[in-house]
Amino acid sequence: MEIRRRPPNPSVKVAHLQYAIPHADAEPRHILEKIVWEKDREVETARQRVPLETLKSQIADLPIPRDFIAALRQASVAPAVIAEVKKASPSQGVIRADFDPVLIANAYAEGGASCLSVLTDKSFFQGGFEVLVEVRQTVGLPLLCKDFILTPYQLYQARAAGADAALLIMAILSDQDLTYLSKVANSLGLTVLVEVHDAEELERVLNLGGFPLIGINNRDLTTFETDLETTETLSKQFATRLKQQGVLLVSESGLFNRADLDRVQAVGAEAVLVGEALMRQSDVCAGLKQLMIGDEGTSNS
């Protein structure tokens, strides 16, 4: 899937007035491209408001990041759960109206989550780096900054807000971009979770090598529909190479109960990332425990 970056609007100055001329390809073709274009605008604005040097200064005073992968491997229940703090999504709209990230994070920690994922995208998920800061101040679990990261600046934002890991989405990055951004992330002490959606993307990541944490997203980012068969198909197709590279495999999206967890664990997923299913629970802590243990009170630990 090709994702075009937002085309520049050349400006023309007439007398003392300056006009921007819309580019011929000024309309995004699908929701993912729309998100990427909006993210470019967000980052431009953020750079002007908070210079990179300011972020570097903030990071200098922070403790070293927590070990995200170790937390997943040490989970008491298998597969390990990365529980997501998410208010809304483009496909579902507002998922939790009474959204309180502090209460949710505490409930996840009490419920047995190994790590947390925090949405920091404002325009489409109603998240923000301020939410990440709140969660960081609340729990000691490793935190994943989940966003559409296109630039090193965003990695500095994530680290300054307290993230221990960052999501890099293969669908919106070239091989060169992924390699560069992962080096920046590593220099900041951030673990990288590389997200793929199809065989072509997973092939690219494995060809590059050096990525011990890979997530298979069961959601089609052009339609936002989910299908657990995505994890099943890709994990089987690339089983040998994933094992050779020592990859910890995460299954993301479309997971709603213990049967779903068993299904992806059976094909090699050592961790799952779950958001919507938990955000819709009136009792998030109880919902997480139910998800991990199931109706019979057993799990494949």
From Swiss-Prot:
Q: In which pathway does it act?
A: Amino-acid biosynthesis; L-tryptophan biosynthesis; L-tryptophan from chorismate: step 4/5
Annotated keywords = Amino-acid biosynthesis, Aromatic amino acid biosynthesis, Decarboxylase, Lyase, Tryptophan biosynthesis
- GO BP field: L-tryptophan biosynthetic process
* Domain of life where this protein originates: Bacteria
Has the keyword Amino-acid biosynthesis been applied to this entry?
yes
| Recorded catalytic activity of this chain's protein | 1-(2-carboxyphenylamino)-1-deoxy-D-ribulose 5-phosphate + H(+) = (1S,2R)-1-C-(indol-3-yl)glycerol 3-phosphate + CO2 + H2O
Cited PROSITE patterns? IGPS
- Reported EC number(s) for this entry are 4.1.1.48
Q: List the molecular function annotations (GO) for this entry.
A: indole-3-glycerol-phosphate synthase activity; phosphoribosylanthranilate isomerase activity
Top EC class of this enzyme: lyase
Q: Which CDD domains does this one have?
A: IGPS
Family, per entry? Belongs to the TrpC family.
This protein's name: Indole-3-glycerol phosphate synthase
In its UniProt entry, the species of origin is given as: Prochlorococcus marinus (strain MIT 9303)
